[in-house]
Amino acid sequence: MVQISQIGAVLAVCSTLTVAAPTKGKARFNVPQVAVPMKAVHHPAVAYARALHKFGMKVPKAVSDAARGSVPTTPTKDDEQYVTQVTVGQGKLNLDLDTGSGDLWVFSTETPKDQSQGHNLYMPTSKSKRLDGYSWEITYGDMSSAGGDVFLDTVSIGNVTASSQAVESAKKVSDQFAKDKATDGLMGLSFSVLNTVQPKPQTTFFDTVLKQLEKPLFTCTLKHGQPGSYDFGYIDDSKHSGEIAYTNVDNSQGWWGFTAESYSIGGGSNSTHSFHGAQHHGARGSSIDGIADTGTTLMLLSDDVVQEYYKQVQGAKNDQQQGGWVFPCDAKLPDFTLSISGYNAVVPGKFMNYQAVGSVCFGGLQSVGSSGGVPNIFGDVFLKSQFVVWDTEGPRIGFAPQA
């Protein structure tokens, strides 16, 4: 994961990447998510800390303390995690698809047995090509980490195969990853400039197979409380209602960045507000820049917007012990609407109830912080409310209500 301070270096190596040109192919495929029972449920501050660190933001001490001090709990029968099955080499792995990163890293037979137990493993064979002298390492805000070496191997999703895809094999993972048995790694779907392999970044799976696809795009239909799906190379119009509203993407830092002009909380004629405030939140006049990221669970916005939202939630407070905004679990939560190129994207209030922590519930909307130059993050809490098109032509991103 790339920090803000590293962006200059990342952009410098961008020109060394060889990305498949978006010439028209014929392939299209659907990838349904699958539900995997969770073996442990972490404190939501863990997800919050990872998101902040992922984008180079300072992790407040209260958030860090809550994340480090938490103990995984036994899940209920309804606790599930949604992953995507990907064939890596000779085996199938359950991976998280992450539009906020450019790495494809996996548990493997190189991962120590005490760290890989319970995971599906990538097994390099004689057909796998090790990239001598290449390595990768990632550290998250809750101090979870992973690292290892790099192979070129076949990676397949649906009917599309990348015959020489960089696969980052984990030779070490922290306890946080080892204990998360639901996932066997991560597949990054950002622009390839964010790939962290050294000494030379590698292309993402999407960029590798781009010329095979009918259209140079993918879509996601993530769901609240149930598995969603990804479609590559085409737009399934049965999955959305109404027209798709497109807006330009700023990929200068490797992310799927876009601009929202305004927001509203709840309903009524007096509920609409423009994004405003200090430039340290990326505001340009009445607009605000954000990043669409399937790899971030929460939605992270500026302090003033977050505070205004929770003023309308009875009993809500920024709890230092829990590391974020919490509220009574039976509290009525207002809808949150973003205006994007004239389209109103509505996040239902129920999506803002992320997870119970003791006698209260942790909010799906949290503060992005106040460090200079930090981006706003539109994570799964937002994305699960929309049908989203990620189009490399432009590039642009599109939104529509889910059917």
Swiss-Prot record:
The keyword Secreted applies. One of its GO terms (molecular function) is aspartic-type endopeptidase activity. Keywords: Aspartyl protease, Disulfide bond, Glycoprotein, Hydrolase, Protease, Secreted, Signal, Virulence, Zymogen. Residues 1-20 form the signal peptide. Its main location: secreted. The keyword Signal applies. It catalyses: Hydrolysis of proteins with broad specificity. Generally favors hydrophobic residues in P1 and P1', but also accepts Lys in P1, which leads to activation of trypsinogen. Does not clot milk. Coiled coil: none annotated. Its EC number is 3.4.23.18. This is Aspartic endopeptidase PEP1. The gene is PEP1.
